[in-house]
Amino acid sequence: MVAGTAGWWVLLAYRVPRVPSTPRIAIWRKLRSLGVAQIGDGLVALPEDARTREQLEWVAADVDAAGGSATLWRAEMLSARDEQLLVTQLQQARAEEYRSLLTEAEQLGADPVTDRARTLTRLRRELRRIRRRDYFPPPEEELARYAVESLAGRTGQPIRVEGAPA
């Protein structure tokens, strides 16, 4: 195990029938919303904890219900290099999402918007959504969090910086 990595991983190996496509697309969207690392075709991974294990168990049940096959595995990387590559893949995916959120927050701060409070609420919701699937926070997380919450001061809303020291 590498410092700052998971140690144990939950792997989901799955196959979903091509037809009908609706269940396959729903499963793909669910996996995407969980922030999985794509290891190969039909093989995804998440760092192991009770929450991620349960989430992948639910996806496996959805795969079975769609007429496919799914197997859950608990694995430990034998190579520190391979584990770091997987962690980096997850970090880069979340960093891209945080950068997008940061850009939107900066644009909102620069533009005179009449309904800034509603947009701020949406940005906060998006930030929470990204953080739920962020297992190895990149530096962009803190920047996006600060940008979103600094808007609160300009809208008159209370500033709620999650995870910041009191």
Where in this protein do the model-derived segments appear?
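Proline-rich intrinsically disordered, low-complexity coils
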Residues: 20-23, 112, 158, 165
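Positively charged, polar, low-complexity stretches
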Residues: 1-110, 119, 131-132, 151
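Glycine-rich, aromatic-bearing surface loops/beta-hairpins
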Residues: 126-166
